[in-house]
Design a protein with these regions (language model features):
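Short alpha-helix capping/helix-loop boundary micro-motifs
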Residues: 62-67
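HotDog/MaoC-like acyl-thioester-processing domains
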Residues: 71-76, 80-123
Length: 123
């Protein structure tokens, strides 16, 4: 996770909270340094899971998003995904719905984000 990526994403999404890009401001907080924007963490960890879980699928939504630990510039993030449920689509013949839980972990194996995601895939 690079500092430049975090600042770029934060400003691109018009998030003006200085905790994400102002080191002097962040030094006065409990974290002492800028936090990576949580929506960037969500996007990154979702992206890390696409190749294994949903490369040819369509996202239907996220739920139960939790952020149990902060992410900082310099952290190395990886993703783990488990399938929670699968079923045939009731409205789209030939498609299935898969529900997964994905966790993002840092280099210390601390969970930094966890969420459930529903994906529609062609059968």
């Amino acid at each position: 996770m690079l500092e430049a990526d975090n600042v770029w994403f934060t400003l691109l999404t018009m998030n003006t909270n200085p905790i994400h890009f102002d080191a002097e401001y962040a030094a006065g907080t409990e974290w002492k340094k800028p936090l990576v924007d949580s929506t960037f963490t969500l996007a990154l960890v979702t992206g890390l899971s696409v190749q294994d879980v949903s490369e040819h699928g369509v996202n239907l939504g996220w739920k139960e998003v939790r952020l149990p630990a902060p992410v900082f510039a310099g952290d190395t993030i990886r993703a783990e995904t488990e399938v929670l449920a699968k079923r045939e689509s009731q409205s789209r013949p030939g498609f299935g719905i898969v529900t997964v839980r994905t966790r993002g972990l840092n280099q210390r194996d601390e969970v930094v984000i966890e969420f459930e995601r529903s994906i529609m895939l062609e059968l």
